[in-house]
Amino acid sequence: MKNKLILALLFCCSFHNLSGQNIQSPSPWFTVNEVLPRVWVIDDHKAVNIYLVIGTDSALLIDTGMGAADLFTQVRKLTAKPLIVVNTHGHVDHAGADYQFGKIYIHAADSSDARACNLPESRANAAKNLLGRAVPQPADTYKKQEIHSKFVAVKDGYIFDLGDRHIQVIETPGHTPGSICLLDKGKKLLFSGDNDNTAVWLFLPNCTPLSVYYKTLQKLSGRLSEFDLLLPGHGIPKKNDFILDQVECVKSILNHTCVSEPYETFAGKAQLCKYGQASVAYNPDNL
């Protein structure tokens, strides 16, 4: 009954009006809510979700956001436990504050991108693009701090041991070659980065062919019994069967039955295919 109540809350509400605890952020840049017991979402200026999972022995920070404000201090307001930091992939909106932490776990295929996006000008440009406007410049925004972090490669099956919680890496190439999801099997949660957003971007220059992403979705669809909730990098939580709509969406692109429509953002032009709840923006030349 408790799990059903949590599910109902998650799917009827956004992160910003859940009944979980919220706290005053030390920076006006962030909004912070405890969306499940000892699972915090740090909303990075309404552009991306950063997750903090707190175990009995240590805590796991999943992604670091745009790097536009003092994330380290924000995290330390939530927990004093030893901190592990992992990137779901190497894009600047997910790895932009890596420079604030000493060690970053990331798939080897994305580590060079994560390092490159931590240049101060990269962080500034990304925030401006994502927010669609000039970004305010408080004292803690866009420090000209270079990155000296150590990147440590993780592979499929790697386990982050937090004490009472064990978070498993699942390789999910598609949005980037080194994308990963993070499975909290004990709590039946999947932290999915940009793999399972409402609209998944598969048209960027470093995206894998769509056929590779299709295999990723098939892999996850075979593991639906291991998680009930998807906690994505953008937007609100989704039920696990959202992945089934994604499978059908991509299948319809690959078999040329989808009636797509033009799609354009600051990142470029694409075609958009929709199926059920899912949408995929893709490059017709990269199937």
Which residues are covered by each model-predicted region?
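Active-site HxH/HxHxD metal-binding segment of metal-dependent hydrolases
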Residues: 68-161, 198, 248-260
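Active-site-proximal loop/helix segments of hydrolase catalytic cores
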Residues: 170-206, 210-214, 218
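Accessory terminal helices/loops
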Residues: 21-22, 215-287
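Metallo-beta-lactamase
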Residues: 22-23, 27-37, 109-170, 185-186, ...
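Conserved beta-strand hairpin/beta-sheet module of binuclear metal-dependent hydrolase folds
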Residues: 28-77, 181-197
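Active-site environment of divalent metal-dependent phosphoester hydrolases
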Residues: 49, 67-70, 90-96, 111-113, ...
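Bacterial Sec-dependent N-terminal signal peptides
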Residues: 1-22
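Active-site neighborhood of phospho(di)ester-bond hydrolases with catalytic His/Asp-centered motifs
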Residues: 62-64, 83-93, 105-108, 171-174, ...
